[in-house]
């Protein structure tokens, strides 16, 4: 079964990936590289790094695509690749946004009170 390649994902606009393990290893490695530019105490880095390392170890350990899909629990492997691409994009944006830095100005005292 590992040698067979599916013809379609059944999802419009999402093509079949012929080398999903290689693609995921590249994406997860890039995500980890980008996270290295974020302070170690930032929550986003801490948790994203943990999840990405777990997923990368699954990709390295499981050669069968079907079993990998089940372990990752992210849908078809092409959907997992799309999620990784989106995470890489977000990680790059987080570096620009710097959410770990203090606010420019203090929020109003009643900002979090509801109802007003």
UniProtKB/Swiss-Prot annotation:
Q: Which GO terms describe its biological process?
A: respiratory electron transport chain
Q: Where in the cell is it found?
A: Mitochondrion inner membrane
Q: Does the keyword Hydrolase apply?
A: no
Output the InterPro entries linked to this UniProt entry: NDUFA5
A GO term from the CC aspect: respiratory chain complex I
List N-acetylalanine occurrences by residue.
2
Please classify the protein's predominant subcellular localization into one broad category. mitochondrion
Please give the residue positions where the record annotates the modification N6-succinyllysine: 98
Keyword Oxidoreductase attributed? no
Mark the residues carrying the PTM Phosphoserine: 89
Domain of life of the organism encoding this protein: Eukaryota
Q: How does it sit in the membrane?
A: Peripheral membrane protein
Q: Which UniProt keywords apply?
A: Acetylation, Electron transport, Membrane, Mitochondrion, Mitochondrion inner membrane, Phosphoprotein, Respiratory chain, Transport
One Pfam family matching this protein: ETC_C1_NDUFA5
Residue list for modification N6-acetyllysine: 30, 46, 60, 98
Q: How does it assemble?
A: Complex I is composed of 45 different subunits.
Functionally, this protein is described as follows: Accessory subunit of the mitochondrial membrane respiratory chain NADH dehydrogenase (Complex I), that is believed not to be involved in catalysis. Complex I functions in the transfer of electrons from NADH to the respiratory chain. The immediate electron acceptor for the enzyme is believed to be ubiquinone.
* Family designation: Belongs to the complex I NDUFA5 subunit family.
Protein name, as recorded = NADH dehydrogenase [ubiquinone] 1 alpha subcomplex subunit 5
Species, as recorded: Bos taurus
Q: Which gene encodes it?
A: NDUFA5
């Amino acid at each position: 079964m590992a040698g067979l390649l599916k013809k379609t994902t059944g999802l419009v606009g999402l093509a079949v990936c012929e080398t999903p393990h290689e693609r995921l290893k590249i994406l997860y490695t890039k995500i980890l590289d980008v996270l290295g530019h974020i302070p170690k105490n930032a929550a986003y880095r801490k948790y994203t790094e943990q999840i990405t390392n777990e997923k990368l170890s699954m990709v390295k350990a499981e050669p069968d695509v079907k079993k990998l899909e089940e372990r990752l629990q992210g849908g078809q492997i092409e959907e997992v690749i799309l999620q990784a691409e989106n995470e890489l994009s977000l990680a790059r944006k987080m570096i620009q946004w710097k959410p770990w830095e203090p606010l420019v100005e203090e929020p109003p005292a009643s900002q979090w009170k509801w109802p007003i």
